Amino acid sequence: MKSHKFSSGPAVTGQCLCGSVQFEMEYPAFWAWHDHSRASRLAHGAVYATYVGTWRKRFRITAGDREISRFEEKETGAVRSFCRCCGTPLVYERTRSPYMINIPRALFQSRTGRQPIYHIAIEDMQDWAYAGEPLSPLKGYPGVFCRRSKRKSRV
């Protein structure tokens, strides 16, 4: 953890892929969860997004504020912020929680004080998502794994 102090605790730091935008959040986070919604899937380009949520007053941009681009979802009014240099999703703000801010967990450089134990929009989870099936190394491709094929029983 970085040595900066907020009113009640130390800060954890994070940044976008290119490092243009940097931020800090007071430790610990309020909650963490996996979001399987279509909107988060499209915003992140991934099967789901993992967020850390905290009070807005416990989060601050420390560098690169001018590099942040914002997008408002017309249906929900939610605002998603991205680094305009590298495209990294930075912040997700929901209209029904105006005092809270949600940050992708992967952007933090250390522990946030919360493990993602919640799942939202589970009904939107894709059938092609990895669900913990056993994996085997792919022959000839070091570091690549694949689902084990189910053997058909011979009659």
Feature-to-residue mapping (PLM):
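A short Gly-Trp-Pro
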Residues: 1-15, 20-155
